[in-house]
Amino acid sequence: MIKIEHLSKIYKRLVLNDISVTFPERQVSVIVGINGSGKTTFLDCVVGLKRPSEGEIWIDSHHNQSDPFKEQVFYIPSDFYLPDYMTGNEYIQFVLARYPNADLDKVDSFFELYDLKEAKNQLLESYSFGMKKKVQIIAAVLSNAPYVLGDEVFNGLDFETTLITVKLFQALLDHRSFVLISHNMTIINHFCDHIFLMSNGKLVPFTGDVSQLEAEVLRTESVHDKITFIQRYATFDDNVSE
C-alpha cells in the first residue's frame, strides 16, 4: 500500500496541510476538488517530482525517493511532454525499459486496442492530444507497475476510449492499484467506492452518496462566491429585461 504521513507543502502559502492517508492495494481511488486545491501538487509529492515541506511517503518499507518505490509506480501527469522526435513505439519501448516486469510482448496488441496501429511508427509530433494520452495509458498498463497514479487521465479521450479504459482498469484490479485525479462524472460514478475530497489543503475520504458530491464541492468558499455572483447577475439581468 501507499502510505502518506503528515504531508505538507508550502509555497507562498500552505497548499497541503498535514495529510495522512493510505491507498490500499487493488482498488481505484479518485481524488476530486476544485482547481488550485492542491491535487496535482499532492501527486507530484507522492511520486517524488516535488519534495514536501514535511512528511513521508512509503510503499511498504520503500521511501518515495528510492529506486524500489519508483519501479512500483507509474505516473501520468496532466501536463505531460512526449518527445516529438520519437515514434509512438520508440517511446513505449524507452519508458518500459525501466520497469523490470513490463509486458513488452503486448505492445502491438495495445496499439491495436487503442486504435493506434497505423500510427505506431509515426513521430509523436504528429499525434493529437488524445493519441498522446492513449500512449501514456498504454505505457502505464504495460509497465506492470503495481500502482498507477494519474492526473486527469481521461482528458482528451472520446467516450468510447474512456469506457474501454475504465473496463481495462477494472480488469486489472486483481494485482494493480490506481490513484486518479478526475472531475469526470463518468469516472467518479464508476469508481465511487473510494473517493477523496481535496479542500483547504486537506485530503479526506468522501463517505456520502456520489450524488451529494456536487453539493459538497459547491460549499467550498471560492465556488460558493462564484455561485453567489451568478445568482446576482441573473437577478440583475431579469431586472434589466423588465
What kind of feature is each model-predicted range?
Residues 32-34:
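The feature captures the beta-strand-to-loop junction immediately N-terminal to the Walker
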